[in-house]
Amino acid sequence: MKKFMTATMMVAVLAAGGASLPAAEAAGVFFADAPVVSSATTAPVATPGTRPAIYIPGQITTPYIDRDLTTDENMFFLAIEKADYNTMQLMLDKGVDINAYYSVKDTTPLGRAMRMNNRTTIQFLLERGADVQGYVFDRGENHTHSYLVAAADKGDLALVQYLHNWGADINGLSWSYGYGFYNALFTLGTSSDDLNVMRYLIAQGINVNYVTSNGGTTPLIYFAQMYISAGDRQNILKMLLDAGADPAVRDASGKTAVDYCIARNDLDSARFLQTYVRQ
């Protein structure tokens, strides 16, 4: 990955009017080349349970703007898209809410920067008070969108690390119609990028026994259900088991991860789960 701050970016923005760019290092936090996390990394010991409690976040409070945007708000979002830091700062100075969820845009300012994957804009907004946790997009149901979960969904280890270093909860939750509330593990697949993200999340203490609010799926069940090779499945299952995942947990239909391995005709993985002994 290229260095977060480049000389060409700085020259271009300064030439545009001398706006204050995000510092190369913000409170000791900056984008850098993300190291590959060794597969030998061990995670903190998790406490297994038959039905872990579902954690629904309450720490995120988001101003909700359900109307047409003002001229200043429209200009602010356009400035985010154009990476115009002078205009962004001007609109903030005029009172545009940096943390509001704007229903017309279906996101927050930081959410828009995340979707555009503009690292300079992400840091610019965080340095000016954007909430690194995420936002609530349904006030009645407290449905949340975690920026860290979104970064994991991209398989972007550098962004996951960056947001976590800024203070994003490693156990932050997003909500979807399928799973209800879910953590970052439920966004991952079998690619090398995803596995590196998984190793980092586990090493930082993510709840490997999290139960989704719809269906009662655990990470073990999630990967047991996935259409992947037996070798890939066992590799991931071992990572989760080594971190304390409990194979005895049943979902809302009463099935365990072993049952889903059998449903995928993966006898080797089913036997692996039944005979696993943690070292």
Language-model region placement:
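Positively charged n-region of N-terminal signal peptides that target proteins for export
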Residues: 1-4
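Hydrophobic helical h-region of N-terminal Sec-dependent signal peptides
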Residues: 6-14
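C-terminal segment of classical bacterial N-terminal signal peptides
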Residues: 15-23
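N-terminal segments that cap or nucleate solenoid repeat domains
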Residues: 44-105
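Ankyrin-repeat boundary/"N-cap" motif
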Residues: 68-78, 101-111, 135-150, 173-188, ...
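Ankyrin repeat A-helix N-terminal signature
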Residues: 78-83, 111-118, 150-156, 183-194, ...
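Ankyrin repeat domain, specifically the short helix-to-loop turn at the C-terminus of the second helix
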Residues: 89-97, 123-131, 161-169, 199-207, ...
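Leucine-rich solenoid repeat scaffolds
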Residues: 247-279
